[in-house]
């Protein structure tokens, strides 16, 4: 296994002068592995917090974060106890895992003694604080420290501001946050940071000497400070006496101090060559201000590394779980004491909770296995042929809707990535703003614009400008000192009426405002710029060539598995959500479309598949779409459990019959899915499920309009035969795949590298926000502040919060809703295909090998195989 990144490197502070130069750019790039890019909240995209650390195991990362940051990424004991009470953890599996652990660790004592101790410790009850504070236990620890077990002689590097006192560390974060907000502001403030165009460090350098928040002495310290960020970093590091070998670890510690703001800087540096040094400049500002704050205290006293293991909790564990008395402990020989201390150290809290988590995950995997292997789909009615086929996003919220839709009639459903393999940038009618409607790990290759006839478009544009002018005038008055005083008088009556309506009758008010806006704007019928016309300002071609049209259609159909037996009507279903007063609205939309609705992509694909020229080219690839098959586009509104039609061309008789049948069953499907979903949402009771669902979407005081992707736990890649009719409880990403149509394995590789990666990121973001909400979550929605148009903070001086609010993962203050399980990926394919995938895809193999995902497969004979254990053998 490869060596772990330097986050895991244990270091002693070495107060020595630099003896050699180093490449600062390379060190910053390497240090950036400990953080993840953070996208603006308007295009909220799931982020895997530990994506740069997958070269090491999940447990190694957990230990390092616990020791360096006091951040625990294993679920706490109370979460496991609750899961056990709900029957989600099989104790038999837990016991087997303990036996396996003991078999692989020679305890150096009688097996019965070791097993009894570990079983008692595995109950997860806390050692009483009185015992840990006991003088007698401390005396025993002092005696045992004389050579029974090696002590820790190292410590993790931390910013020097930490050792200068909590005040210095807090002030450093406070100042850095302030400058980040000023530099990154996206049009929220009326005042723009001077010299911003020169870069973050240069702007800071020219303005910091005038910062009224600094004392005169602090400002004077920065007189003559280097103009170049690399020189500033080197000067600060030399002043701190950080050795060359420790520089990267020191930079990592600073990045981890504010991972949200650092993550935003990292993301910005990856988007434009103009800002490619932004993360380096961020570190230069941070180190410069750290030097300014700690310079009076230099040289700081050398931190005292731990010279011995903290034996108190180890001895206390044997008194508590091992049933020993202090007298019995003293009767043990030195070798016996050492063996017991070694076992207690190895079977520590992290090891115990690792076993609990793995038992929980294996219990869930066993349930999925039982559901799949025992699933016997109802035989299709031979008298009723398939009327329509639906392609849904793999999103876990699609699973209940697909299940209900299939039960309602002769329909087939398929799962694929919600951007439908369309690497496009979209531009809606009447706006210059474009959106990259694809996963954030990809870049758009084509631009598609909405167009309309000149006269209706002109009217629409005028109405839209009028609405925008009103909004702009309101914002201008709000930010102007004198006009702001008049604003309450001018806007008070209207805003009071709006507040009363939205508070007292949110459902009716929301619908009324929506209808009024729609009536006022009068958006005309639109077309899509499918034909290649020009190149956009960003250098992206607008529209497609004939070959590109066919290539996109071919790729999408193959990825979703619809290449033959076409129904009269094929519906491409994007998905989006609807909520009010919700800064996390984009988190409820399609993650595969960059935190937006997949409606635009669905329209593009459906339109391409209806083109005769595209169908003609597809025939040469063996994909024969019947002349009477029509593609339509719809949007699955997850907050309302509704399907809204977006694009329905002229329909021949059979397709019209299918369309009518779909419309007749959709109300019942919506009611069924809505009632199922409402049972999981905290609410005070309701009489009409449909009205309650609409209220959740329109109520601006609603902190939880829907659960989003909470409780996601598995990603199943295979034919619908595996899961059709099975109730997966909205916890599974479902991607259609038939290994028989994938001879070279390219389709499976594409699924794993694309949708599989996005699903893993989603899974680990929900996981992190649940187990460590104070560090990886974003706190309470009710107390959040939208900051600089970029993201949210708690108050006005916190880190930029990268994760999900507790309302997205918690049922109440004391009860979690999301089960923090690492993603289980199940692939329907022969063993040889899985081995080929693992041999080709080193990154995917590494994820499974190091415990970032779990991998299982089902072969053509229906046999289940757990690959995670096989890989590690």
UniProtKB/Swiss-Prot annotation:
Asked if the keyword Zinc belongs to this entry, the reply reads: yes
Look up the domain of life of the source: Bacteria
Give me the Gene Ontology terms describing cellular component: plasma membrane
Q: Name the InterPro entries for this protein.
A: DabA
How does it sit in the bilayer? Answer: Peripheral membrane protein
Where does this polypeptide localize? Cell membrane
The main location class comes to membrane
What is a GO molecular function of this protein? zinc ion binding
Cofactors named for this entry? Zn(2+)
Instruction: Could you list this entry's UniProt keywords, alphabetically sorted.
Output: Cell membrane, Membrane, Metal-binding, Transport, Zinc
Q: Does the keyword Metal-binding apply?
A: yes
Disulfide topology: none
Q: Give one Pfam family.
A: DabA
Identify the residues that bind Zn(2+).
393, 395, 575, 590
Role this protein plays: Part of an energy-coupled inorganic carbon pump.
Family, similarity comment: Belongs to the inorganic carbon transporter (TC 9.A.2) DabA family.
PANTHER family to which the protein is assigned, alphabetical: INORGANIC CARBON TRANSPORTER SUBUNIT DABA-RELATED, UPF0753 PROTEIN AQ_863
Assembly notes: Forms a complex with DabB.
Record protein name field: Probable inorganic carbon transporter subunit DabA
- Per the UniProt record, the source organism is Bacillus licheniformis (strain ATCC 14580 / DSM 13 / JCM 2505 / CCUG 7422 / NBRC 12200 / NCIMB 9375 / NCTC 10341 / NRRL NRS-1264 / Gibson 46)
Upper lineage: Bacteria, Bacillati, Bacillota, Bacilli, Bacillales
Question: Which gene produces this protein?
Answer: dabA
């Amino acid at each position: 296994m490869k060596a772990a990144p330097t986050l895991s490197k244990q270091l002693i502070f070495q107060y020595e002068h630099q003896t050699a130069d180093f490449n600062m750019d390379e060190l910053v790039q390497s240090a950036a592995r400990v953080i993840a890019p953070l996208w603006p909240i308007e295009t909220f995209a799931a982020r895997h917090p530990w994506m740069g650390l997958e070269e090491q195991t999940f447990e190694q990362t957990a230990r390092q974060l616990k020791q360096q940051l006091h951040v625990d990424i294993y679920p706490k004991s109370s979460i496991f106890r609750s899961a056990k009470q709900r029957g989600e953890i099989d104790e038999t599996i837990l016991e087997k895992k303990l036996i396996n652990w003991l078999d692989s660790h020679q305890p150096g004592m009688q097996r019965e003694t070791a097993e009894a101790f570990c079983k008692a410790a595995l109950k997860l009850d806390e050692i009483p604080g009185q015992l840990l504070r006991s003088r007698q236990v401390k005396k025993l620890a002092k005696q045992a420290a004389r050579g029974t077990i090696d002590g820790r002689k190292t410590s993790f590097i931390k910013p020097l501001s930490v050792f200068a006192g909590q005040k210095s560390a807090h002030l450093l974060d406070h100042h850095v946050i302030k400058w980040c907000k000023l530099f990154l502001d996206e049009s929220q403030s009326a005042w723009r940071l001077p010299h911003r165009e020169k870069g973050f460090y240069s702007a800071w350098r020219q303005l910091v000497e005038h910062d009224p928040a600094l004392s005169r002495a602090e400002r004077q310290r920065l007189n003559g400070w280097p103009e170049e960020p690399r020189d500033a970093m080197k000067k600060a590091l030399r002043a701190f006496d950080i050795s060359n070998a420790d520089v990267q670890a020191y930079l990592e510690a600073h990045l981890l101090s504010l991972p949200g703001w650092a993550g935003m800087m990292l993301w910005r540096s990856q988007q434009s060559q103009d800002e490619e040094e932004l993360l380096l400049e961020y570190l230069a500002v941070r180190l410069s201000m750290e030097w300014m704050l700690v310079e009076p205290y230099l040289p700081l006293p050398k931190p005292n590394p731990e010279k011995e293991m903290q034996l108190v909790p180890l001895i206390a564990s044997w008194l508590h779980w091992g049933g020993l008395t202090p007298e019995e402990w003293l009767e043990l020989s030195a070798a016996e004491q050492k063996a017991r201390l070694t076992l207690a150290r190895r079977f520590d809290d992290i090891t115990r909770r690792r076993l609990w988590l793995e038992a929980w995950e294996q219990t869930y995997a066993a349930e999925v296995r039982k559901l799949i292997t025992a699933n016997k789909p109802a035989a299709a009615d031979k008298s009723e042929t398939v009327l329509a086929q639906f392609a849904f996003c793999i999103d876990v919220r699609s699973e209940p809707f697909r299940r209900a839709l299939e039960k309602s009639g002769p329909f087939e459903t398929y799962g694929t990535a919600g951007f439908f393999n369309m690497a496009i940038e979209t531009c809606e009618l009447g706006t210059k703003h474009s959106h990259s409607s694809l996963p954030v790990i990809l870049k758009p290759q084509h631009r598609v614009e909405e167009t309309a006839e000149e006269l209706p478009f002109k009217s629409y544009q005028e109405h839209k400008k009028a609405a925008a002018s009103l909004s702009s005038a309101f914002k201008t008055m709000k930010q102007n000192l004198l006009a702001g005083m008049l604003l309450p008088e001018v806007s008070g009556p209207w805003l009071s009426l709006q507040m009363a309506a939205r508070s007292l009758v949110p459902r009716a008010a929301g619908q009324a405002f929506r209808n009024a806006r729609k009536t006022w704007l009068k958006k005309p019928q639109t077309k899509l710029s499918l034909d290649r016309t020009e190149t956009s300002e960003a250098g992206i071609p607008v529209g497609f060539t004939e070959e590109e049209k066919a290539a996109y259609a071919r790729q999408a159909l193959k990825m979703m598995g619809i290449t033959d037996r076409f129904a009269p009507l094929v519906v491409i279903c994007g998905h989006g959500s609807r909520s009010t007063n919700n800064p996390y609205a984009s988190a409820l939309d399609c993650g595969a479309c960059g935190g937006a609705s997949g409606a635009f992509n669905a329209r593009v694909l459906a339109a391409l598949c209806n083109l005769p020229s595209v169908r003609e080219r597809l025939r040469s690839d063996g994909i024969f779409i019947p002349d009477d098959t029509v593609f339509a586009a719809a949007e699955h509104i997850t907050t309302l459990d509704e399907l809204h039609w977006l694009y329905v061309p002229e329909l021949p008789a059979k397709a019209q019959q299918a369309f009518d049948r779909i419309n007749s069953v959709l109300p019942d499907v919506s009611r069924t899915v809505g009632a199922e979903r409402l049972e999981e949402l905290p609410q005070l009771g309701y009489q009409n499920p449909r009205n309650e669902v609409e209220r959740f979407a329109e109520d601006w005081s609603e902190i939880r309009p829907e659960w989003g992707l909470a409780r996601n736990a598995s990603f199943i890649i295979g034919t619908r035969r595996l899961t059709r009719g099975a109730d997966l409880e909205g916890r599974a990403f479902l991607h259609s795949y038939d290994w028989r149509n994938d001879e070279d394995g390219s389709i499976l590789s594409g699924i794993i590298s694309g949708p599989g990666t996005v699903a893993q990121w989603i899974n680990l973001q929900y996981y992190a926000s649940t187990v460590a909400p104070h560090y990886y979550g974003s706190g309470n929605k009710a107390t959040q502040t939208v900051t600089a148009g970029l993201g949210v903070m708690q108050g006005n001086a916190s880190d930029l919060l990268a994760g999900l609010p507790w309302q997205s993962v918690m049922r109440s203050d004391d009860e979690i809703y999301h089960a923090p399980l690492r993603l289980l990926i199940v692939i329907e394919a022969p063993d040889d295909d899985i081995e080929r995938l693992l041999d080709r895809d080193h990154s995917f193999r590494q994820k499974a090998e190091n415990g970032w995902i779990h991998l299982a497969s089902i072969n053509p004979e229906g046999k289940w195989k757990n690959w995670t254990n096989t890989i590690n053998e």
